[in-house]
Amino acid sequence: MNVVKRPLDISQLPDAGEVIVDAEGHVAGRLATYIAKALLERPNLRIVVVNAEKLVITGDEKMVIEWFKRKISEWRTHYNPEKAGPKVPRRPDRVFKRIVRGMLPKKSETGRSALKRLRVYMSIPIEIMQRKRLVLYEVPEAKLRLRPLLQYTTLEEVWRSIDPEAWEKWRRAVEVWGKKLKQVASG
């Protein structure tokens, strides 16, 4: 398998087909705006985002985690503990898809069809890894630029602190997936 990483420019996107974006090291909001714009401008283009757990959210780690915890728990009250308010995603792939959804006009047919053409995965699925030539695109404008005293956290770290049991299950599944990937690569 041949893996190639290339920078991606919105003006050079194909009109149809599939584009695979590697989200590692990208700032979540910046990448989401780029993807939302591309989905709206190109109605026949499918975008696949891989490594969603490595997306970055800037800000103090404790502040970001507390914000997520408050967002998840604010709808349950003492008077009505079973209240089912808005469902807030916890997994990194679903969090990122929700961020992109917030940037699309979800009440119009254009926005709904654009969201259907977006796929977000944690790590890289085996179906994608089995391709003979894999081109992973990166968005240079959305990459995290490291500066002194810059505080950031990844979506995986946020997920680990919010839902440690689910994170641990996923971590074990990644180990099994790694073994399968080695088998695919060798045979």
From Swiss-Prot:
One of its GO terms (cellular component) is cytosolic large ribosomal subunit. Keywords: Ribonucleoprotein, Ribosomal protein. GO terms for molecular function: mRNA binding; structural constituent of ribosome. InterPro entries: Ribosomal_uL13, Ribosomal_uL13_bac-type, Ribosomal_uL13_CS, Ribosomal_uL13_euk/arc, Ribosomal_uL13_sf. One of its GO terms (biological process) is translation. NCBIfam families: L13_A_E, PRK06394.1. This protein is one of the early assembly proteins of the 50S ribosomal subunit, although it is not seen to bind rRNA by itself. It is important during the early stages of 50S assembly. HAMAP family: Ribosomal_uL13. Part of the 50S ribosomal subunit. Belongs to the universal ribosomal protein uL13 family. This is Large ribosomal subunit protein uL13. It comes from Pyrobaculum aerophilum (strain ATCC 51768 / DSM 7523 / JCM 9630 / CIP 104966 / NBRC 100827 / IM2). The gene is rpl13.
